[in-house]
Amino acid sequence: MTFGEKLKIARKKQFLSQEAMAKEMGVSFSTLNRWENGKAEPNYTAQKAFHDFCVKHKIKFDDKE
């Protein structure tokens, strides 16, 4: 499973728009949109922000995904 796919699943589990998720992660809407659509890859800081978001909201992904 790609980062973008995980991002989209986590966002939808929290019933957030891309704009709201971007704000919570501290990035722009266009950046989050590019990640979800596989047009860009996040840097370490962004990956950490996503990890922290998942921990905060108790969202887990199987390592095999």
What are these regions (language model features)?
Residues 16, 27, 59:
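Short glycine/serine/threonine/alanine-rich loop segments
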Residues 12, 23, 55:
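Short polybasic/polar patches that bind polyanions
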Residues 5-20:
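Short basic helix-loop element that most often maps to the first helix and adjoining turn
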Residues 27-42:
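Recognition helix of helix-turn-helix/homeodomain-like DNA-binding domains
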Residues 10, 24, 35:
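Residues in the recognition helix of alpha-helical DNA-binding motifs
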Residues 44-63:
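DNA major-groove recognition helix of helix-turn-helix/homeodomain DNA-binding modules
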Residues 1, 11-13, 27:
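Short amphipathic helical patch at the helix-1/turn junction of helix-turn-helix
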